[in-house]
Amino acid sequence: VCKNNIVVANANVIVNIPPFGNPAITGAAIAPSSSQGPTDDGRIKPDITGRGTNVYSCDDSTDSSYGNSTGTSMSGPGVAGSLLLLQEHYNNLNSSFMRSSTLKGLVCHTATDDAENPNVSAIPYPGPDPFWGWGLLNAKFAAQTIIDAQTNAAIVEEKILNNGEIYSFTVNVSGSEKLMATICWTDLAGQLQNGILNSTTPALVNDLDIRITDSDNNEYLPWKLDLSNLPYAIKGDNIVDNIERVEVDLPTAGQYTITISHKGIIPGTTPGSQGIQEYSLIVTGSDLTTTLSNGENELSDFLVWPNPAKEMINYQFASQS
């Protein structure tokens, strides 16, 4: 199963639409025909769930016929259409489109956890699972996060991690809602498992990490599947997924440090060289304000040219590691 795509599950979702007020989910369950994860190496798949049962859509009876259909052939297009609208919304505000990793990270970050809705037939524990993925697509929350990022009430950023770099910054929260931070990246192609069935070797090439630390130095770790106790998820060092989400469920008001780093060496384009990894960062919470931490990088080289300069300068740096 590919690392960088978005795998969509099919759920039977019942929505109550009142004459006034907001629609509400009154029932939902994964369709029996919807494929389940995880992958052989333990990655969280599917990624997201959409409504795909008894969906009114066009059919192949005539040129103009419609009918009810069921399957991921319904949930997949529904999710894809929502993602296109999110791209349009982002472009309207930023005059550019999101990277695929940003879009994927955003919808997984803002998904409605199936365990948090009492009307959903789900795994009775929070976090991702191999049936729903990260949960039901929540396009409203995703769109609001894009809006909130305009006023620094949320973070939706596209960044680059250099080999050996540790990127760290702090956020101040009021403590009135959950603090969540997600990174997602388009990973390089892994080793071909030619002729090997059910290989548990991680397909991940560049293993990025995200952590949240509070003022008492308590460290919060990302979700990962508990392969010894499926379908449940636990929090720990995730070495297989190219999306990681960390949560502080009941944050106290104050300052939290978010740190992004990586294991091993980020390979370059030529054998033996060192490279970079583009990644996307999404953070939501309450009344976020951000500041970069001091000394977030220790550098072995820092080059600036030309010198003297008139209008433009170039710079290049390398970390000590």
Spans of model-derived segments:
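Short proline/glycine-enriched turn/loop motifs at strand-loop junctions of beta-rich domains
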Residues: G52, W185, V205, A318-S321
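Secreted peptidase-domain scaffold signal
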Residues: P128-N206, D214, S273-T291
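Hydrolase catalytic cores
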Residues: T49-N119
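C-terminal edge strands of extracellular/lumenal beta-sandwich accessory domains
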Residues: T102-K104, Y167-F169, N198-L204, R211-D216, ...
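Catalytic-core environment of secreted peptidases
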Residues: A11-A24, I30-P77
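Surface-exposed, proline-anchored Ser/Thr-rich loop/turn motifs
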Residues: G295-Q320
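Structural recognition of the beta-strand scaffold that forms the well-ordered cores
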Residues: I6-A9, P46-G50, Y56-S57, S75-G76, ...
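Acidic glycine-/aspartate-rich tracts in secreted/extracellular proteins
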Residues: N12-V15, T53, T112-A115, T186-L188, ...
